[in-house]
């Protein structure tokens, strides 16, 4: 008689907006990780939705959780709680719950009470984001931002004390957490660099023409227009640079958001600055990344950033805000700035002396296969070894 196949242990990835991803962030991380781990685990991924239910996407079980969108982080905390309760009811034999953002630490308490193995990813120093955003918020909303920042600080503490393991996505964040909270089990696991589909030169020129751009005649930033991502710094700096080149900023624009209103006001009548809104078509994103004069990454908080890793594949000059987690990735192969005036000087240098940089060797430890193997070991160490498949990813 043939032996029955050993069922794969069930794991849940909780806290992203869901799969398939658009670009960057937790969604890309969850998608790339789940499609590699599904050979060894029965993977559940929670998805923000307008309904409840479970379906499949590329062999991964999507758990749809009704969620209300909001500019603060209070609702995601509730979303994680609902997702945890739903999974405990619908996937009763799930072995491990992995919360991909620090606010999941509150929900990890529930999973621990239900005797599940738990992991929480602290992401960046998330509570600092709210303090930066608060400066641009309406006065009557600032107490809410302050309260949310405090909730995230508590979440950071819980993320280091409640789960069976805590994940830091950069060595600088790991050092910070170890010094401040002394987690019982602290692991380093970064993100991977997504490879976009190749686009032939004729198609690239066509895409650029539609966007009103020319090859190597624009600076580029791809990211959410939120205060901690520092886009106001680059607009302020670029306006002081005498150049016919353009500044292209790609990211979803909420025209009611006070920070977006600030960016539009700061841009003024400068026609060189183009706020293109969200662009998710891979061929267009590839074309923009491949043909920029330089890429500006003004993010001030966070850990390893997937959008930055993605840009490094193109070997265009990168100008980054000077923080340890950017230096950790880019090393000496980048321009660094702390103020708008420093950025002005860097852009003037690039204008007169453009150069390319080879970042590929930096990316060896940032491939998704490498990252998935790291996570396999972490998950495997927490789940009953007799129930895990020992084969290699």
Language-model-derived ranges and their functions:
Residues 2, 6-9, 16-22, 36-71, ...:
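N-terminal strand-loop element at the rim of the active site
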Residues 12-14, 208-229, 235-242, 248:
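Conserved donor-binding/catalytic core segment of Leloir-type glycosyltransferases
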Residues 54, 203-206, 246-272, 276, ...:
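Short, structured helix-loop element that forms part of the nucleotide-activated donor/catalytic region
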Residues 75-89, 94-128, 303:
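An aromatic- and histidine-rich active-site surface loop
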Residues 145-166:
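Membrane-proximal helix-turn-helix segments that form the acceptor-binding/catalytic region
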Residues 173-194:
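Helix-loop-beta element that forms the nucleotide-linked donor phosphate-binding surface
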Residues 300:
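Aromatic "clamp/platform" in nucleotide-sugar-dependent glycosyltransferases that forms part
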Residues 313, 317-320:
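Short hydrophobic beta-strand element within catalytic cores of glycosyltransferases
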């Amino acid at each position: 008689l043939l032996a029955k196949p050993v069922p794969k242990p069930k794991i849940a990835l909780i806290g992203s907006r869901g799969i398939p991803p658009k670009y960057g962030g937790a969604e890309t991380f969850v998608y790339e990780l789940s499609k590699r781990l599904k050979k060894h685990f029965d993977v559940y991924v929670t998805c923000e939705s307008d309904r409840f239910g479970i379906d499949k996407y590329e062999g991964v079980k999507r758990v749809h959780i009704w969620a209300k969108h909001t500019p603060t982080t209070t609702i995601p905390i509730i979303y994680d709680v609902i997702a945890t309760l739903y999974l405990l009811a619908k996937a009763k034999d799930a072995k491990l719950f992995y919360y991909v953002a620090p606010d999941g630490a509150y929900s990890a308490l529930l999973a621990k009470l239900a005797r599940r193995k738990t992991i929480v990813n602290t992401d960046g120093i998330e509570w600092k984001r709210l303090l930066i955003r608060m400066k641009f918020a309406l006065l009557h909303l600032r107490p809410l931002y302050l309260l949310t920042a405090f909730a995230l600080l508590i979440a950071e503490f819980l993320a280091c004390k409640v789960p069976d393991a805590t994940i830091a996505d950069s060595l600088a964040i790991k050092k910070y957490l170890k010094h401040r909270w002394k987690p019982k089990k602290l692991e380093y696991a970064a993100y991977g660099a997504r490879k976009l589909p190749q686009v032939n030169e004729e198609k690239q020129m066509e895409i650029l023409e539609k966007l009103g751009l020319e090859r190597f005649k624009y600076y580029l930033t791809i990211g959410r227009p939120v205060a901690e991502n520092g886009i106001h710094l680059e607009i302020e700096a670029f306006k002081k640079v005498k150049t016919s080149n353009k500044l292209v900023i790609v990211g979803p624009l909420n025209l009611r958001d006070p920070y977006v209103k600030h960016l539009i006001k700061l841009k003024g009548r400068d026609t060189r600055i183009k706020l293109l809104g969200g662009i998710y078509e891979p061929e267009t994103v590839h074309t923009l990344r491949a043909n920029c004069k330089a890429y500006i990454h003004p993010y001030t908080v966070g850990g390893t950033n997937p959008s930055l890793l993605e840009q490094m594949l193109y070997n265009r000059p990168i100008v980054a805000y000077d923080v340890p987690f950017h230096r950790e990735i880019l090393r000496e192969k980048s321009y660094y700035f702390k103020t708008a005036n420093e950025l002005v000087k860097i852009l003037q240098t690039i204008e007169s002396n453009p150069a390319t940089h080879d970042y590929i060797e930096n990316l060896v430890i940032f491939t998704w296969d490498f990252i998935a193997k790291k996570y396999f070991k972490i998950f495997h160490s927490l789940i009953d070894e007799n129930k895990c498949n020992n084969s290699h990813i």
